[in-house]
UniProtKB/Swiss-Prot annotation:
<comment type="subunit">
    <text>The RNAP catalytic core consists of 2 alpha, 1 beta, 1 beta' and 1 omega subunit. When a sigma factor is associated with the core the holoenzyme is formed, which can initiate transcription.</text>
</comment>
<comment type="function">
    <text>Promotes RNA polymerase assembly. Latches the N- and C-terminal regions of the beta' subunit thereby facilitating its interaction with the beta and alpha subunits.</text>
</comment>
<dbReference type="GO" id="GO:0006351">
    <property type="term" value="P:DNA-templated transcription"/>
</dbReference>
<protein>
    <recommendedName>
        <fullName>DNA-directed RNA polymerase subunit omega</fullName>
        <ecNumber>2.7.7.6</ecNumber>
    </recommendedName>
</protein>
<dbReference type="GO" id="GO:0000428">
    <property type="term" value="C:DNA-directed RNA polymerase complex"/>
</dbReference>
<keyword id="KW-0808">Transferase</keyword>
<dbReference type="GO" id="GO:0003899">
    <property type="term" value="F:DNA-directed RNA polymerase activity"/>
</dbReference>
<keyword id="KW-0548">Nucleotidyltransferase</keyword>
<dbReference type="InterPro" id="IPR003716">
    <property type="entry name" value="DNA-dir_RNA_pol_omega"/>
</dbReference>
<comment type="similarity">
    <text>Belongs to the RNA polymerase subunit omega family.</text>
</comment>
<dbReference type="GO" id="GO:0003677">
    <property type="term" value="F:DNA binding"/>
</dbReference>
<dbReference type="Pfam" id="PF01192">
    <property type="entry name" value="RNA_pol_Rpb6"/>
</dbReference>
<dbReference type="InterPro" id="IPR006110">
    <property type="entry name" value="Pol_omega/Rpo6/RPB6"/>
</dbReference>
<dbReference type="InterPro" id="IPR036161">
    <property type="entry name" value="RPB6/omega-like_sf"/>
</dbReference>
<keyword id="KW-0804">Transcription</keyword>
<keyword id="KW-0240">DNA-directed RNA polymerase</keyword>
């Protein structure tokens, strides 16, 4: 397992504070939301995986924002489809 240094990730993001926010968001995606890592897991924890992804330039605040917008769009589309199916079912009953 290669050691990840925070300095390598900071260089990609710009400053420590933004890097911490990006790493936390990405680690949460991996750990809680079930998103697939973009690098080999190598038995690392989600925070280390997130730092390695940032270090390689695979994850930025912009990519996380775009991913979250896509997730919201997909969720909204599913909700609209569900409401349409319910409405159609009611129309068939009447």
């Amino acid at each position: 397992m290669a050691r990840v240094t925070v300095e390598d990730a900071v260089e990609q993001i710009g400053n420590r504070f933004d890097m911490i926010l990006v790493a936390a968001r990405r680690a949460r995606q991996i750990a809680v939301q079930g998103k697939d890592p973009m690098v080999e897991e190598e038995n690392d924890k989600p925070t280390v995986i997130a730092l390695r992804e940032i270090e390689l330039g695979l994850v930025t605040a912009d990519t996380l924002d775009a991913d979250e917008r896509q997730t919201v769009r997909e969720r909204e589309a599913a909700e609209i489809a569900a409401v349409a199916a319910i409405a159609e079912g009611r129309n068939n009953v009447i």
